[in-house]
Amino acid sequence: MTVLIHVLGSDIPHHNHTVLRFFNDTLAATSEHAREFMVAGEDNGFTESCPALSLHFYGSKKVLAQAVIAKAKANRRQRFFFHGQFNTSLWLALLSGGIKPAQFYWHIWGADLYEVSHGLKFRLFYPLRRIAQGRVGGVFATRGDLSYFARQHPGVRGELLYFPTRMDPSLNAMAKERQRAGKLTILVGNSGDRSNQHIAALRAVYQQFGDTVNVVVPMGYPANNQAYIDEVRQAGLALFSAENLQILSEKMEFDAYLALLRQCDLGYFIFARQQGIGTLCLLIQADIPCVLNRDNPFWQDMAEQHLPVLFTTDDLNEQVVREAQRQLASVDKSGITFFSPNYLQPWHNALRIAAGEAE
């Protein structure tokens, strides 16, 4: 029997760390198909912190892709589970036959599914990638992303699967301890990545609420982002008074980030695709409603779980926000499909499907 190989094809330390720790701590002991990884980027202590995994690191996305293609050609029974935003060379290999459809299973994280970049090289590449995506052996994704993908590729198998957000189920009831009143605090974006469209989001918040709310913008990740942080700060200060705007430029530890989220009353996410599911889960767990772009299909997942959804096109005010908080507080968090530990069983199923052990 050939063991399934997992591929983290882009050097995205935060996401890669979450996936590797999840597999090491939760899946590796239960399945031999959850232990073998090929990772773009440096070790950064992963080997030491994930002793249950067999990790192989590659200095660039291109070098990793070459290694994957070589393995795929050497053994056509070898199957790969590609996690998230990988790389151009892998799509082209699927398109050219270097990797066969039966070898290629993909967990969609969002970015590689949507065509949002306007650069010429992206616009030229998107049609090729779209054809390649129709050749994958199967996909795993959120309900909204599965729906989006199926409209383009109805013949490809799709299974529900959620990114393994680090969550403590014992915190599901913690929000009840806080009384919410006074000036609203609004979280804008889930990181410092430009995909959050921070400036457009700040303008949208100002248009809805004016300079009457506290605005918190976490921008400590990714690193080496100071020029963009300064740009966002300047745009924010043109709208909000200094005491109402908090731009966080330092990377935060998880517990500190969790504490920050729990001080908020509303999350505001303007991006027109599924991303930031980890932050959304942590906000929902704390009874903090989220404002989504109507083009972000994750609203379908939220609606399926009977969670209130606010949209950027809605007329928002404090009364609307407080009512959404009340509705969230009435939801039994233990039953939410994309919360821990409910997302575990679909992962076990995904491993068996990708490994060829389940129909």
UniProtKB/Swiss-Prot annotation:
GO terms for biological process: enterobacterial common antigen biosynthetic process; fucosylation. InterPro entries: WecF. Pathway: Bacterial outer membrane biogenesis; enterobacterial common antigen biosynthesis. One of its GO terms (molecular function) is 4-acetamido-4,6-dideoxy-D-galactose transferase activity. Keywords: Cell inner membrane, Cell membrane, Glycosyltransferase, Membrane, Transferase. GO terms for cellular component: plasma membrane. It catalyses: beta-D-ManNAcA-(1->4)-alpha-D-GlcNAc-di-trans,octa-cis-undecaprenyl diphosphate + dTDP-4-acetamido-4,6-dideoxy-alpha-D-galactose = alpha-D-FucNAc4-(1->4)-beta-D-ManNAcA-(1->4)-D-GlcNAc-undecaprenyl diphosphate + dTDP + H(+). It is a peripheral membrane protein. It is an enzyme of class 2 (transferase). It holds the Pfam family Glyco_transf_56. Its EC number is 2.4.1.325. Belongs to the glycosyltransferase 56 family. This is TDP-N-acetylfucosamine:lipid II N-acetylfucosaminyltransferase. It comes from Salmonella paratyphi C (strain RKS4594).
